[in-house]
């Protein structure tokens, strides 16, 4: 891992406790073991549940209670969310989202597919996006905001806010219009989960292997308006860092360090 990446991760870790206290409703939901409201369970990424119905004395006797096929035969990463009595399941490309009723034999309440007319919201075809995706065509999951929104970060980098009850689009924005990378190809893609902080949703991007200048971008959860964007490499004004207060290896990184 590069020093830059270590610095970004350390900065994010320090900021998270403030974000948690600022979104008390989401924090309260995270503490409810009957729900799974964020990828990895909480901001700390513990991936731990306090539910004790399954334990070391009965785990060897587990049997399949039910199963659900998404119909997408690609790699799968990320976890389903459980909000109340509804489970939200996502897929790899084309990034379909399902809402299942856990009280009614996993009935499909709604299904959302961001690919319409063969294209993603940003105008890219599915085949075009697949051609520049690294390491399989996976998606690392949707996330939830307590205002009743499921957020999807699609493979073409679109950020899509869905009504948790109906699956209808609240807003859609294309994070990066696939950009032109070092080798003259549209190379920006999205596979990471959206991250809910206060009343914002943040997303990163992929494509550095094609020369894409990646970044972290924050959007207003209510309307999808872009709030700010910080790049992973300089100059400092584009990284949105204070070179004297941002540290690496316990020392200030200094002006234009990248």
Regions found by a protein language model. Name each.
Residues 33-40, 75-96, 127-159, 185-213, ...:
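Repeat-blade elements of multi-bladed beta-propeller folds
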Residues 162, 214-225:
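Beta-propeller blade signature
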Residues 1-9:
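Bacterial N-terminal signal peptides that target proteins for export
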Residues 54-57, 100, 162, 219:
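Hydrophobic/aromatic beta-strand positions that recur at structurally equivalent sites within the blades
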Residues 101-105, 164-166, 221-223:
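Short loop/turn segments that connect beta-strands within beta-propeller blades
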Residues 23-70, 107-131, 168-177, 225-234, ...:
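Aromatic (tryptophan-biased) beta-strands that constitute blades/sheets of beta-rich domains
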Residues 13-14:
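Short, linear, compositionally biased motifs with a strong N-terminal bias
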């Amino acid at each position: 891992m590069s020093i830059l990446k270590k610095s970004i991760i350390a900065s994010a870790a320090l900021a998270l406790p403030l974000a948690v206290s600022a979104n008390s409703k989401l924090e309260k939901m995270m503490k409810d073991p009957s729900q799974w409201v964020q990828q990895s369970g909480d901001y700390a990424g513990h991936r731990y549940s306090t539910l004790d119905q399954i334990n070391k004395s009965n785990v060897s006797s587990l049997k399949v209670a039910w199963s659900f096929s998404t119909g997408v035969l690609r790699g799968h990463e990320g976890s389903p969310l459980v909000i109340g009595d509804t489970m939200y399941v996502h897929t790899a490309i084309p990034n379909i989202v399902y809402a299942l009723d856990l009280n009614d034999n996993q009935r499909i309440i709604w299904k959302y597919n961001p690919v319409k007319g063969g294209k993603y919201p940003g105008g890219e075809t599915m085949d075009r996006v697949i051609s520049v995706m690294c390491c399989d065509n996976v998606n690392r999951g949707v996330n939830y905001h307590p205002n009743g929104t499921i957020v999807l970060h699609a493979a073409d980098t679109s950020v899509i806010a869905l009504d948790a009850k109906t699956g209808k689009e609240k807003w859609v924005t294309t994070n990066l219009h696939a950009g032109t990378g070092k080798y003259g190809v549209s190379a920006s893609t999205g596979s990471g989960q959206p991250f809910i902080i206060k009343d914002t949703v943040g997303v990163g991007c992929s494509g550095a292997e094609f020369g894409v200048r990646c970044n972290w971008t924050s959007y207003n959860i209510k309307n999808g308006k872009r709030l700010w964007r910080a790049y992973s490499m300089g100059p400092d004004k584009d990284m949105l860092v204070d070179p004297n207060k941002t540290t690496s290896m316990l020392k200030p990184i200094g002006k234009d360090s990248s």
